Design a protein with these regions (language model features):
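Alpha/beta-hydrolase-fold serine-hydrolase catalytic core, especially in secreted/extracellular enzymes
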Residues: 231, 240-243, 248-301
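The feature captures the conserved acid-bearing segment of alpha/beta-hydrolase catalytic domains
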Residues: 169-248
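Gly/Ser-rich "nucleophile elbow"/oxyanion-hole loop immediately N-terminal to the catalytic nucleophile
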Residues: 57-65, 109-157
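Short amphipathic alpha-helix adjacent to the substrate-entry channel of hydrolases
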Residues: 80-100
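Short beta-strand element of the alpha/beta-hydrolase
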Residues: 63-74
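Short glycine-enriched nucleophile-adjacent loop
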Residues: 156-166
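N-terminal cap/lid segment of alpha/beta-hydrolase-fold proteins
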Residues: 22-64
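Bacterial N-terminal signal peptides
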Residues: 7-15
Length: 301
């Protein structure tokens, strides 16, 4: 083999290696409808996760940091392929979203092993580390005092499994709820299965967002809500079934209350809070939504 051929082959291998090591990224739906156009991307320092974040970080600093949404996927899928429009839209309103699983460059079902509960903890660990790292582009730009952990279906079970983590300041349980002894046999194998007693470990406000009576998680979620009396809790329902509206443009109708919940509780936006408060909450002015609160909910600021 000649020297020229060897050099050519070496160059090809180097090109392949460089391409494979480049982080993937994609602008989804023109960056969302929010003030801060967002991007979906991989971060080499956070493997097996997808990050949604404003494209331009110059507006964020220690006095105006990005609150955090940590997300777990339906079916414990190791990719947010069903939820990326919803998550991207939230990021465009000034949040950093850390989703469990591999980046979905196309809207197709992910085929691979299930995700784990630990991946949500890895997301929180990463946010903390990046905010403290002076060499990181996220240095002093992440609001580590305002972290919501959330998830859909199996991702909601992962969220409840992790609910005791003291770094969490808010929860959002979507199309999900803990199984009881009577219906545990309906669960898909591999799902985390905390007992109902786990609800006592919740130490933050929590919102359940369900798809109405046709949602297979409706009974579990409503039962959870009725058991939670020690922290502010609400449950909202929209009659769309278990799949929600996440795959619709910008996440569809579910984005409206989810974003308001995050803006109110993580950013202190009182106007957003009117979605859930007052004589006639804003959510009830929207077609087909219902809202129930526990006794502690109206004490929320």
């Amino acid at each position: 083999m000649t020297k020229k051929v060897l050099l050519f082959m070496l160059g090809c291998f180097m090109m392949i290696d460089t391409a494979s090591s480049q982080s993937k990224e994609l602008i989804v739906e023109e960056g969302g409808t929010g003030r801060y156009k967002s991007i979906m991307k991989e971060e080499a320092s956070l493997p097996a996760h997808t990050v949604f974040v404003p494209q331009d970080l110059s507006a964020f600093n220690a006095t105006n940091p990005l609150p955090v949404l940590v997300w777990g996927n339906g079916a414990c899928t190791d990719s947010p392929w069903e939820h990326f429009k919803f998550l991207n839209e939230i990021a465009s309103h000034g949040f950093i979203v850390l989703a469990t699983g591999y980046i979905p460059m196309v809207e197709e079902p992910y085929k691979g092993p299930m995700s784990t509960t630990q991946q949500q903890i890895e997301s929180i660990d990463w946010a903390m580390a990046q905010n403290a790292d002076s060499t990181s582009p996220y240095y002093q730009k992440i609001d580590t005092k305002n972290i919501c952990v959330a998830g859909m279906s199996c991702g909601g079970l992962q969220t409840l499994f992790n609910c005791a983590d003291p770094r969490i300041t808010l929860l959002m349980i979507c199309n999900s709820g803990l199984f009881n002894q009577q219906n545990a046999g309906q669960a898909v194998g591999g799902m985390p299965m905390p007992p109902k007693e786990k609800l006592k470990e919740i130490h933050t406000p929590v919102m359940y967002m369900l798809g109405g009576e046709t949602d297979i998680a409706y009974g579990n979620g409503m039962d959870d809500f009725r058991r939670i009396q020690h922290v502010p809790a609400c449950v909202i329902n929209y009659p769309v079934g278990h799949g929600g509206t996440y795959r619709q443009p910008h996440g569809g109708e579910f984005t409206i209350p989810a974003l308001a919940w995050l803006q109110w509780q993580l950013k202190g936006d009182k106007e957003a809070g009117k979605m859930f408060t007052g004589k006639t909450p804003g959510l009830l002015k929207r077609k087909d939504w219902t809202l129930e609160k526990n006794a502690k909910f109206d004490k929320l600021q």
